[in-house]
């Protein structure tokens, strides 16, 4: 009798653990997508132009102008593109 109850308990655990792990994976995926979206949103280059470039000291400098945005800066580009860019 105790052996049957022990076997039932093990089977129950085998079904519960994978389903809870899948729920955690879904939540992690949602968080990753949300952070990627806001990172791209903050790095808008629409309407930006200027003379932003990397100097010999490795820092990005130059003038930037953005149409429709109150703040514009020259800085390192997104990690997909190595270089400098104007961002609003």
UniProtKB/Swiss-Prot annotation:
One Gene Ontology term, aspect cellular component: extracellular region
Signal peptide interval: 1-21
Post-translational changes noted in the entry: Contains 5 disulfide bonds.
Main location, first listed in the record: secreted
Tissue expression profile of the protein: Expressed by the venom duct.
Keywords of the record: Disulfide bond, Neurotoxin, Secreted, Signal, Toxin
Coiled-coil segments on the chain, per record: none
Residues excised as propeptide: 22-46
Cell compartment(s), UniProt: Secreted
GO molecular function terms listed in the Swiss-Prot or TrEMBL record: toxin activity
Stated family: Belongs to the conotoxin S superfamily.
Notes concerning its domains: The cysteine framework is VIII (C-C-C-C-C-C-C-C-C-C).
Protein's UniProt name: Conotoxin Ca8.3
Organism: Conus caracteristicus (Characteristic cone)
């Amino acid at each position: 009798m105790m052996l049957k109850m022990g076997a039932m308990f093990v089977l129950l655990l085998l079904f519960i653990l994978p389903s809870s792990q899948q729920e955690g994976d879904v939540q992690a995926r949602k968080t990753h997508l949300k952070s990627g979206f806001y990172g791209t949103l903050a790095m808008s280059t629409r309407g930006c132009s200027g003379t932003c470039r990397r100097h010999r000291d490795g820092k990005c400098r130059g003038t930037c102008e953005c149409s429709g945005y109150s703040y514009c800066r020259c800085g390192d580009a997104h990690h997909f593109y190595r270089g400098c860019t104007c961002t609003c």
